[in-house]
Each structure stands twice: as structure tokens, then as C-alpha cells.
Amino acid sequence: MQPDLSPQLAMVLNYIRHFIDINGYPPSIRDICKATGLRSSSTVYNYLNKLEEKGYIRRDPSRSRAIEILTPYPALTRAKNMVSVPLLGKITAGQPILAFENIEDVFPLPADLAGAENAFMLHVSGDSMIEAGILDGDYLIVRPQDTAENGDIVVALLEDEATVKYFYRYPDHIELVPANSSMQPLIVHKVTILGKVVGLYRHFS
């Protein structure tokens, strides 16, 4: 991420770059709203103004779709098979997963690794999934979906807290099972599924 940009601005800039590389022309305001989850066109205009003030883009107010990228960027982020994946912080019940206030950073990842253009990443805290090879400090790549099959590793929301567990549905209850033999399953009757874990990124220090 560019050091002088917030995660939100970086995500908008990366989306514009990606859209231009794929289509050969800039996105519309509506395109940016849809891709980033922003509901207000005025908010998009505000972000574009900030990017222009910082020298990242140039716009022609007399023409629509007139956004020009001014700053160079690594070939990796320009590749047509790359997607910008947001790293989320706290996930709150009743709030869209990709709400901009949840985004801590943005990472360019190969589309095959991300699994979906709307994928997101979460930072793992704890050792409840160590026997599945998911360690404290790892970054999980998650495909948003609200359903799951038995045996899927999911991100679920329980009482305003996100948890990563194996998912199993039974006739009278749901079990969220840790991959740690020292821990017990969580037995619930209702749960909100936020997504399925489709990949993992680990940094070796």
C-alpha cells in the first residue's frame, strides 16, 4: 500500500488501476460504488478528489470516465490476473463485511489464490485451528458466502465476534469445531456465516 494513502484510498486507487488494465478505459462512479461497497456517489467523488490532490490521478471534469493514473506502480499489481484483497479488522454484526471502516490494508493477490474478486483477508489470533495448519499470525483468504457445507472451514459471527472453525450442521443444532484437540466444539442453534476460508498467507520472519 502507498504509505501516504489510507487503506480506503488505496483500495479505490487499486480498483481503478485494475479496471483500466482489464478494460482499457477508466471506471464510472457507479462502477466504483459497486466494487467498493460505497453507497454514495458523493463519497466516491471525495475519495477521487483526495487521490487527485495527492497526485495519484488526474481527471477531466468535462468528460465522463476521464480518470488518468499518474503514478507508476509495480508490474505485479497491474497484472490482469491480480485482484485487490482488503484486510479486515473488527467485523461487527449488522454492518456490511466490506464496510470501509473495517478495512485495515489492501493486498494485491493472484486471482487464483484469492478465489473470488470480492474475497477478503483476516488476521488469525489464537491457536484454535492449529491442527488444520492455521497458526497464530497467519492471514486467511476468505470467499464471502452465507451458507456452508459440513466440513467447510468458515468465518462465523457469534455475538459480534468473528471466529474461524469447521462447520457442521445437525438436525437440532450447529457445531463449530476447532482444529485443536484441547478445545471443545461450540454448540449453537443459529449462526451467521460470513465466508469460507479458501486460502492462507504466512509471513516467515
From Swiss-Prot:
Cross-referenced Pfam families: LexA_DNA_bind, Peptidase_S24
UniProt DNA-binding residue ranges: 29-49
InterPro entries (alphabetical): LexA (IPR006200), LexA-like (IPR039418), LexA/Signal_pep-like_sf (IPR036286), LexA_DNA-bd_dom (IPR006199), LexA_repressor (IPR050077), Peptidase_S24_LexA (IPR006197), Peptidase_S24_S26A/B/C (IPR015927), WH-like_DNA-bd_sf (IPR036388)
Stated name of the protein: LexA repressor
Coiled-coil regions listed in the entry: none
Gene3D superfamilies: Umud Fragment, subunit A, Winged helix-like DNA-binding domain superfamily/Winged helix DNA-binding domain
Organism: Moorella thermoacetica (strain ATCC 39073 / JCM 9320)
PANTHER family in alphabetical order: LEXA REPRESSOR, LEXA REPRESSOR-RELATED
The encoding gene: lexA
Residue(s) at site: Cleavage: A93, G94
MF annotations from Gene Ontology: DNA binding; serine-type endopeptidase activity
Catalytic residues as annotated in Swiss-Prot or TrEMBL: S128, K165
Protein function: Represses a number of genes involved in the response to DNA damage (SOS response), including recA and lexA. In the presence of single-stranded DNA, RecA interacts with LexA causing an autocatalytic cleavage which disrupts the DNA-binding part of LexA, leading to derepression of the SOS regulon and eventually DNA repair.
Assembly with partners or alone: Homodimer.
Gene Ontology terms: biological process: DNA repair; DNA replication; negative regulation of DNA-templated transcription; proteolysis; SOS response
Signal peptide: none
Keywords tagged on the record: Autocatalytic cleavage, DNA damage, DNA repair, DNA replication, DNA-binding, Hydrolase, Repressor, SOS response, Transcription, Transcription regulation
Classification via NCBIfam families: lexA (TIGR00498)
Xref: SUPFAM superfamilies: LexA/Signal peptidase, Winged helix' DNA-binding domain
Catalysed transformations (reactions): Hydrolysis of Ala-|-Gly bond in repressor LexA
